[in-house]
Design a protein with these regions (language model features):
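Extended C-terminal subregions enriched in glycine
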Residues: 274, 278, 282-305, 314-317, ...
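Active-site-proximal alpha-helical scaffold in enzymes
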Residues: 105-135, 162-196, 236-242, 350-373
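Short glycine/threonine-rich loop-to-helix capping motif typified by GTGT followed
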Residues: 83-92, 266-270, 302-326, 332, ...
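Conserved active-site "lid/cap" helical segment
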Residues: 18-108, 116, 172-180, 201-207, ...
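Conserved catalytic cysteine-centered active-site region
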Residues: 29-31, 79-153, 157-164, 202-228, ...
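Condensing-enzyme catalytic core mediating Claisen C-C bond formation in acyl metabolism
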Residues: 18-52, 185, 216-279, 283, ...
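Beta-strand segments within the central parallel beta-sheet cores of soluble alpha/beta enzyme folds
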Residues: 70-79, 100-101, 129-134, 181-188, ...
Protein backbone atom coordinates (compact mmCIF):
# COMPACT_ATOMS: atom_id res chain seq x y z
CA UNK A 1 0.00 0.00 0.00
CA UNK A 2 1.33 3.42 -0.92
CA UNK A 3 2.13 5.79 1.91
CA UNK A 4 -0.48 8.48 2.49
CA UNK A 5 1.24 11.83 3.08
CA UNK A 6 -1.83 13.01 4.98
CA UNK A 7 -1.48 10.08 7.37
CA UNK A 8 1.88 11.23 8.75
CA UNK A 9 1.45 11.51 12.53
CA UNK A 10 1.42 15.17 13.45
CA UNK A 11 2.19 16.89 16.72
CA UNK A 12 -0.44 16.15 19.31
CA UNK A 13 -1.41 17.29 22.78
CA UNK A 14 0.47 20.18 24.27
CA UNK A 15 2.98 20.48 21.42
CA UNK A 16 0.34 21.02 18.72
CA UNK A 17 0.16 24.64 19.82
CA UNK A 18 3.72 25.16 18.61
CA UNK A 19 2.49 24.78 15.04
CA UNK A 20 -0.28 27.34 15.49
CA UNK A 21 1.53 30.17 17.23
CA UNK A 22 4.95 31.33 18.27
CA UNK A 23 6.19 30.35 21.70
CA UNK A 24 5.72 32.84 24.52
CA UNK A 25 8.43 35.45 24.12
CA UNK A 26 9.72 34.85 27.64
CA UNK A 27 10.23 31.16 26.86
CA UNK A 28 11.64 31.60 23.35
CA UNK A 29 15.25 31.75 22.23
CA UNK A 30 14.34 34.19 19.47
CA UNK A 31 16.85 37.02 19.46
CA UNK A 32 18.37 35.99 22.79
CA UNK A 33 21.54 34.31 21.50
CA UNK A 34 24.01 34.99 18.69
CA UNK A 35 26.60 32.87 16.89
CA UNK A 36 29.80 34.83 17.43
CA UNK A 37 32.36 32.31 16.17
CA UNK A 38 32.42 29.44 13.69
CA UNK A 39 35.33 27.31 12.53
CA UNK A 40 35.66 24.22 10.34
CA UNK A 41 38.91 22.27 10.52
CA UNK A 42 40.57 22.37 7.08
CA UNK A 43 41.83 18.79 7.25
CA UNK A 44 39.97 15.83 5.83
CA UNK A 45 42.63 13.31 6.84
CA UNK A 46 44.45 13.52 10.18
CA UNK A 47 46.43 10.32 10.87
CA UNK A 48 48.91 12.10 13.17
CA UNK A 49 46.45 13.96 15.39
CA UNK A 50 44.44 12.67 18.34
CA UNK A 51 40.70 13.26 18.54
CA UNK A 52 41.19 15.41 21.63
CA UNK A 53 43.76 17.48 19.75
CA UNK A 54 41.29 18.07 16.93
CA UNK A 55 38.71 19.22 19.50
CA UNK A 56 41.27 21.67 20.89
CA UNK A 57 42.17 23.00 17.44
CA UNK A 58 38.57 23.64 16.39
CA UNK A 59 37.83 25.25 19.77
CA UNK A 60 40.80 27.59 19.28
CA UNK A 61 39.68 28.40 15.75
CA UNK A 62 36.11 29.28 16.74
CA UNK A 63 37.20 31.41 19.69
CA UNK A 64 39.69 33.30 17.51
CA UNK A 65 36.98 33.82 14.90
CA UNK A 66 34.78 35.35 17.60
CA UNK A 67 37.56 37.44 19.11
CA UNK A 68 37.25 35.69 22.47
CA UNK A 69 39.47 33.42 24.58
CA UNK A 70 38.86 30.25 26.55
CA UNK A 71 38.79 32.38 29.70
CA UNK A 72 35.53 33.87 28.39
CA UNK A 73 33.85 30.46 28.03
CA UNK A 74 31.45 29.46 30.81
CA UNK A 75 29.38 26.87 28.94
CA UNK A 76 30.51 23.77 27.03
CA UNK A 77 28.62 21.40 24.73
CA UNK A 78 29.82 18.13 23.17
CA UNK A 79 28.46 14.77 22.03
CA UNK A 80 29.64 11.17 21.75
CA UNK A 81 32.64 12.05 19.59
CA UNK A 82 34.32 13.84 22.53
CA UNK A 83 36.80 11.51 24.31
CA UNK A 84 35.63 11.04 27.88
CA UNK A 85 32.61 13.28 27.41
CA UNK A 86 32.14 16.76 28.78
CA UNK A 87 34.01 16.15 32.03
CA UNK A 88 37.19 15.03 30.30
CA UNK A 89 37.01 17.65 27.55
CA UNK A 90 36.42 20.58 29.91
CA UNK A 91 39.53 19.46 31.80
CA UNK A 92 41.57 18.88 28.62
CA UNK A 93 40.60 22.24 27.11
CA UNK A 94 41.33 24.08 30.35
CA UNK A 95 37.84 25.53 30.68
CA UNK A 96 36.02 26.75 33.75
CA UNK A 97 32.30 26.34 33.12
CA UNK A 98 29.10 26.66 35.06
CA UNK A 99 26.95 24.88 32.49
CA UNK A 100 27.54 21.87 30.24
CA UNK A 101 25.53 19.58 27.99
CA UNK A 102 26.55 16.27 26.41
CA UNK A 103 23.29 15.42 24.65
CA UNK A 104 24.02 12.93 21.87
CA UNK A 105 21.59 12.60 18.98
CA UNK A 106 24.12 11.49 16.40
CA UNK A 107 24.63 13.73 13.39
CA UNK A 108 22.19 16.42 14.50
CA UNK A 109 23.69 16.73 18.00
CA UNK A 110 25.27 20.10 17.22
CA UNK A 111 22.01 21.60 15.96
CA UNK A 112 20.42 20.37 19.19
CA UNK A 113 23.35 21.85 21.13
CA UNK A 114 22.87 25.18 19.37
CA UNK A 115 19.28 25.32 20.57
CA UNK A 116 20.22 24.17 24.07
CA UNK A 117 23.04 26.72 24.26
CA UNK A 118 20.62 29.48 23.27
CA UNK A 119 18.19 28.30 25.95
CA UNK A 120 20.95 28.25 28.57
CA UNK A 121 22.05 31.75 27.60
CA UNK A 122 18.46 33.02 27.67
CA UNK A 123 18.07 31.50 31.15
CA UNK A 124 21.26 33.14 32.40
CA UNK A 125 23.08 29.85 32.99
CA UNK A 126 26.03 30.89 30.83
CA UNK A 127 27.06 33.80 28.65
CA UNK A 128 29.61 32.28 26.24
CA UNK A 129 28.97 28.71 25.09
CA UNK A 130 31.51 26.62 23.17
CA UNK A 131 30.33 23.67 21.04
CA UNK A 132 32.91 21.28 19.59
CA UNK A 133 32.95 18.30 17.22
CA UNK A 134 35.95 16.23 16.12
CA UNK A 135 36.83 12.71 15.10
CA UNK A 136 38.77 10.40 12.79
CA UNK A 137 36.48 7.91 11.04
CA UNK A 138 38.80 7.87 8.02
CA UNK A 139 42.13 7.07 9.68
CA UNK A 140 41.32 5.70 13.15
CA UNK A 141 39.85 2.37 14.22
CA UNK A 142 36.06 2.55 14.56
CA UNK A 143 34.73 2.91 18.11
CA UNK A 144 32.57 0.17 19.64
CA UNK A 145 29.17 0.23 18.04
CA UNK A 146 26.41 1.50 20.29
CA UNK A 147 23.47 -0.85 20.51
CA UNK A 148 19.81 -0.18 21.13
CA UNK A 149 17.08 -2.49 22.30
CA UNK A 150 16.48 -3.70 18.75
CA UNK A 151 20.09 -4.79 18.20
CA UNK A 152 19.67 -8.50 18.94
CA UNK A 153 16.67 -8.69 16.63
CA UNK A 154 18.30 -6.95 13.65
CA UNK A 155 22.02 -7.74 13.70
CA UNK A 156 21.39 -11.26 12.38
CA UNK A 157 19.99 -9.74 9.19
CA UNK A 158 23.10 -7.60 8.64
CA UNK A 159 21.22 -4.31 8.55
CA UNK A 160 23.73 -1.58 7.72
CA UNK A 161 23.43 2.16 7.27
CA UNK A 162 23.57 1.82 3.48
CA UNK A 163 20.93 -0.93 3.46
CA UNK A 164 18.49 1.12 5.50
CA UNK A 165 18.89 4.30 3.46
CA UNK A 166 18.58 2.21 0.32
CA UNK A 167 15.25 0.94 1.62
CA UNK A 168 14.10 4.52 2.22
CA UNK A 169 15.01 5.45 -1.34
CA UNK A 170 13.34 2.37 -2.81
CA UNK A 171 10.16 2.98 -0.83
CA UNK A 172 10.07 6.62 -1.94
CA UNK A 173 10.45 5.51 -5.54
CA UNK A 174 7.69 2.95 -5.13
CA UNK A 175 5.23 5.33 -3.50
CA UNK A 176 5.90 8.54 -5.40
CA UNK A 177 7.67 7.65 -8.64
CA UNK A 178 10.97 9.24 -7.63
CA UNK A 179 13.82 8.29 -9.96
CA UNK A 180 17.55 7.69 -9.61
CA UNK A 181 18.09 10.54 -12.06
CA UNK A 182 16.30 12.93 -9.72
CA UNK A 183 18.35 11.80 -6.74
CA UNK A 184 21.50 12.26 -8.82
CA UNK A 185 20.73 15.96 -9.25
CA UNK A 186 21.37 16.44 -5.53
CA UNK A 187 24.92 15.14 -5.93
CA UNK A 188 25.36 17.24 -9.07
CA UNK A 189 24.38 20.39 -7.18
CA UNK A 190 26.75 19.58 -4.32
CA UNK A 191 29.62 19.03 -6.78
CA UNK A 192 28.99 22.37 -8.48
CA UNK A 193 29.51 24.05 -5.10
CA UNK A 194 32.45 21.88 -4.00
CA UNK A 195 34.59 22.97 -6.95
CA UNK A 196 34.99 26.35 -5.23
CA UNK A 197 35.92 24.92 -1.83
CA UNK A 198 39.71 24.44 -1.55
CA UNK A 199 39.25 22.05 1.37
CA UNK A 200 36.60 19.82 -0.23
CA UNK A 201 37.48 16.14 -0.42
CA UNK A 202 35.86 15.80 -3.85
CA UNK A 203 36.21 18.87 -6.07
CA UNK A 204 35.27 17.50 -9.48
CA UNK A 205 31.95 18.54 -10.98
CA UNK A 206 29.88 15.49 -11.86
CA UNK A 207 26.88 14.86 -14.10
CA UNK A 208 23.74 12.84 -13.63
CA UNK A 209 25.28 10.19 -15.86
CA UNK A 210 28.40 10.07 -13.67
CA UNK A 211 26.26 9.37 -10.62
CA UNK A 212 24.23 6.67 -12.35
CA UNK A 213 27.38 5.02 -13.70
CA UNK A 214 29.09 4.89 -10.31
CA UNK A 215 29.04 1.47 -8.58
CA UNK A 216 25.81 0.36 -6.95
CA UNK A 217 26.19 0.30 -3.15
CA UNK A 218 22.69 -0.53 -1.94
CA UNK A 219 20.01 -0.51 -4.62
CA UNK A 220 18.98 2.11 -5.68
CA UNK A 221 21.83 4.12 -4.13
CA UNK A 222 25.07 4.42 -6.09
CA UNK A 223 28.44 5.31 -4.64
CA UNK A 224 27.99 8.95 -5.60
CA UNK A 225 24.69 9.00 -3.73
CA UNK A 226 26.70 8.48 -0.52
CA UNK A 227 28.58 11.04 1.56
CA UNK A 228 32.34 11.15 1.95
CA UNK A 229 34.07 9.81 5.07
CA UNK A 230 36.45 12.36 6.59
CA UNK A 231 38.50 13.20 9.64
CA UNK A 232 38.22 16.68 11.08
CA UNK A 233 35.64 18.68 12.96
CA UNK A 234 34.27 22.10 13.75
CA UNK A 235 33.23 24.40 16.55
CA UNK A 236 30.82 27.22 17.35
CA UNK A 237 30.76 30.02 19.90
CA UNK A 238 27.31 31.18 21.02
CA UNK A 239 26.85 34.22 23.22
CA UNK A 240 24.55 36.92 24.52
CA UNK A 241 23.34 39.81 22.36
CA UNK A 242 25.38 42.25 24.45
CA UNK A 243 28.66 40.38 24.03
CA UNK A 244 28.02 39.67 20.34
CA UNK A 245 27.44 43.34 19.61
CA UNK A 246 30.73 44.24 21.29
CA UNK A 247 32.72 41.98 18.97
CA UNK A 248 34.06 42.87 15.53
CA UNK A 249 32.19 40.15 13.67
CA UNK A 250 29.03 40.17 11.53
CA UNK A 251 26.00 39.42 13.69
CA UNK A 252 24.13 36.13 13.25
CA UNK A 253 21.09 35.84 15.48
CA UNK A 254 19.22 32.64 16.36
CA UNK A 255 15.48 33.00 15.89
CA UNK A 256 14.07 29.46 15.98
CA UNK A 257 14.96 25.85 16.79
CA UNK A 258 13.05 22.60 16.94
CA UNK A 259 13.97 19.00 17.69
CA UNK A 260 12.16 15.67 17.53
CA UNK A 261 12.66 11.90 17.58
CA UNK A 262 10.99 9.38 15.30
CA UNK A 263 10.87 5.67 16.05
CA UNK A 264 8.66 2.62 15.67
CA UNK A 265 6.69 3.56 18.80
CA UNK A 266 6.09 0.17 20.31
CA UNK A 267 5.93 -1.91 17.17
CA UNK A 268 3.75 0.28 14.96
CA UNK A 269 4.17 -0.10 11.21
CA UNK A 270 7.09 2.10 10.18
CA UNK A 271 6.71 4.54 7.29
CA UNK A 272 10.09 4.95 5.60
CA UNK A 273 9.09 7.99 3.55
CA UNK A 274 9.16 10.72 6.17
CA UNK A 275 11.54 11.85 8.90
CA UNK A 276 11.35 13.58 12.28
CA UNK A 277 11.74 16.82 10.35
CA UNK A 278 7.94 16.86 9.97
CA UNK A 279 7.91 17.79 13.67
CA UNK A 280 11.15 19.72 14.26
CA UNK A 281 10.57 21.98 11.27
CA UNK A 282 7.17 23.42 12.28
CA UNK A 283 8.45 24.16 15.78
CA UNK A 284 11.44 26.09 14.44
CA UNK A 285 9.37 28.02 11.89
CA UNK A 286 6.72 28.90 14.47
CA UNK A 287 9.30 30.18 16.93
CA UNK A 288 11.12 32.17 14.24
CA UNK A 289 7.89 33.60 12.87
CA UNK A 290 8.92 32.91 9.27
CA UNK A 291 7.94 30.48 6.51
CA UNK A 292 9.85 28.47 3.94
CA UNK A 293 9.35 31.35 1.51
CA UNK A 294 11.58 33.52 3.70
CA UNK A 295 14.53 31.10 3.62
CA UNK A 296 17.27 32.34 1.27
CA UNK A 297 19.71 29.49 1.91
CA UNK A 298 19.35 25.97 3.34
CA UNK A 299 21.98 23.67 4.82
CA UNK A 300 20.42 20.21 4.62
CA UNK A 301 21.94 17.06 6.11
CA UNK A 302 23.26 14.95 3.24
CA UNK A 303 24.50 11.58 4.42
CA UNK A 304 22.85 10.27 1.24
CA UNK A 305 20.96 11.94 -1.58
CA UNK A 306 17.69 10.44 -0.34
CA UNK A 307 18.31 12.13 3.03
CA UNK A 308 18.21 15.54 1.35
CA UNK A 309 15.14 14.81 -0.73
CA UNK A 310 13.07 13.54 2.19
CA UNK A 311 14.02 16.44 4.44
CA UNK A 312 13.17 19.05 1.81
CA UNK A 313 9.70 17.54 1.66
CA UNK A 314 9.33 17.21 5.42
CA UNK A 315 10.39 20.82 6.03
CA UNK A 316 7.80 22.06 3.56
CA UNK A 317 9.97 23.28 0.70
CA UNK A 318 7.85 21.07 -1.53
CA UNK A 319 4.92 18.71 -1.07
CA UNK A 320 5.43 15.13 0.05
CA UNK A 321 6.23 13.01 -2.97
CA UNK A 322 7.31 15.98 -5.11
CA UNK A 323 10.90 16.15 -3.90
CA UNK A 324 12.20 14.48 -7.05
CA UNK A 325 10.78 17.20 -9.26
CA UNK A 326 11.93 19.90 -6.84
CA UNK A 327 15.61 18.92 -6.85
CA UNK A 328 15.87 18.20 -10.59
CA UNK A 329 17.44 20.42 -13.23
CA UNK A 330 19.77 22.28 -10.89
CA UNK A 331 17.16 23.74 -8.55
CA UNK A 332 19.58 23.42 -5.60
CA UNK A 333 22.55 25.08 -7.35
CA UNK A 334 23.44 28.56 -6.10
CA UNK A 335 22.83 31.17 -8.79
CA UNK A 336 20.75 28.73 -10.83
CA UNK A 337 17.93 27.26 -8.75
CA UNK A 338 15.30 28.48 -6.32
CA UNK A 339 16.87 27.05 -3.16
CA UNK A 340 20.67 27.12 -2.90
CA UNK A 341 21.81 24.32 -0.59
CA UNK A 342 25.09 23.14 0.94
CA UNK A 343 27.23 25.68 -0.87
CA UNK A 344 30.43 24.26 0.62
CA UNK A 345 29.82 20.95 -1.16
CA UNK A 346 28.21 19.42 1.91
CA UNK A 347 28.74 15.90 3.12
CA UNK A 348 28.31 14.53 -0.39
CA UNK A 349 31.48 16.23 -1.62
CA UNK A 350 33.32 18.25 1.01
CA UNK A 351 33.18 17.05 4.60
CA UNK A 352 31.18 14.71 6.81
CA UNK A 353 33.38 14.73 9.92
CA UNK A 354 32.97 11.88 12.40
CA UNK A 355 29.98 10.74 10.31
CA UNK A 356 28.18 13.63 12.03
CA UNK A 357 27.47 16.37 9.51
CA UNK A 358 25.29 18.72 11.55
CA UNK A 359 28.14 20.98 12.64
CA UNK A 360 29.26 21.82 9.11
CA UNK A 361 25.66 22.58 8.15
CA UNK A 362 25.56 25.35 10.74
CA UNK A 363 29.00 26.67 9.80
CA UNK A 364 28.14 27.10 6.11
CA UNK A 365 24.85 28.79 7.01
CA UNK A 366 26.83 31.24 9.16
CA UNK A 367 29.20 31.89 6.24
CA UNK A 368 26.26 32.67 3.98
CA UNK A 369 24.66 35.05 6.48
CA UNK A 370 27.99 36.81 7.05
CA UNK A 371 28.60 37.10 3.32
CA UNK A 372 31.75 34.98 3.69
CA UNK A 373 30.92 32.09 1.36
CA UNK A 374 32.92 31.78 -1.85
CA UNK A 375 31.84 34.56 -4.26
CA UNK A 376 30.79 31.98 -6.84
CA UNK A 377 28.25 30.46 -4.44
CA UNK A 378 27.40 33.36 -2.12
CA UNK A 379 23.64 33.90 -2.08
CA UNK A 380 22.80 37.58 -2.75
CA UNK A 381 21.08 39.39 0.12
CA UNK A 382 21.13 36.29 2.29
CA UNK A 383 19.37 37.45 5.45
CA UNK A 384 17.61 34.29 6.70
CA UNK A 385 19.07 30.78 6.58
CA UNK A 386 18.05 27.34 7.77
CA UNK A 387 20.21 24.46 8.95
CA UNK A 388 18.69 21.03 9.43
CA UNK A 389 20.11 17.67 10.38
CA UNK A 390 19.26 14.14 11.37
CA UNK A 391 21.00 11.65 13.63
CA UNK A 392 20.59 7.91 13.80
CA UNK A 393 19.07 5.95 10.94
CA UNK A 394 16.62 7.89 8.81
CA UNK A 395 14.25 5.03 8.11
CA UNK A 396 13.97 3.79 11.67
CA UNK A 397 14.87 5.43 15.00
CA UNK A 398 16.42 8.85 14.54
CA UNK A 399 16.40 12.44 15.76
CA UNK A 400 16.09 15.67 13.80
CA UNK A 401 16.80 19.29 14.59
CA UNK A 402 16.01 22.45 12.66
CA UNK A 403 17.65 25.83 13.30
CA UNK A 404 16.72 29.16 11.72
CA UNK A 405 19.12 32.10 11.83
CA UNK A 406 19.12 35.66 10.56
CA UNK A 407 21.65 38.32 9.69
CA UNK A 408 21.39 41.44 11.81
Amino acid sequence: MASDPLAIPRLTGQTIRWEKRQRRSDLSIKGKAYIAGAYEHPTRKAPDKSIAQLHAEVAKGALEDAGLTKADVDGYFCAGDAPGGAMAMVDYLGLKVKHFDSTDTGGCSYLVHLGHAAEAIAAGKCSVALITLAGKPLTAAPPPRATGAEHDFEVAYNATTHNIYGMCAMRHMHDFGTTSEQLAWIKVAASHHAQYNPHAMLKDVVTVEDVLNSPMISDPLHRMDCCVVTDGGGALVVTTPEIAKSLKRPLVRLIGQGEAIKGPRGGEALDLTYSAGVWSGPVAFAEAGVTVKDIKYASIYDSFTITVLMQLEDLGFCKKGEGGKFVADGNLISGVGKLPFNTDGGGLCSNHPVNRGGMTKIIEAVRQLRGEAHPKVQVPNCDIALAHGTGGLLGVRHAASTVIMERV
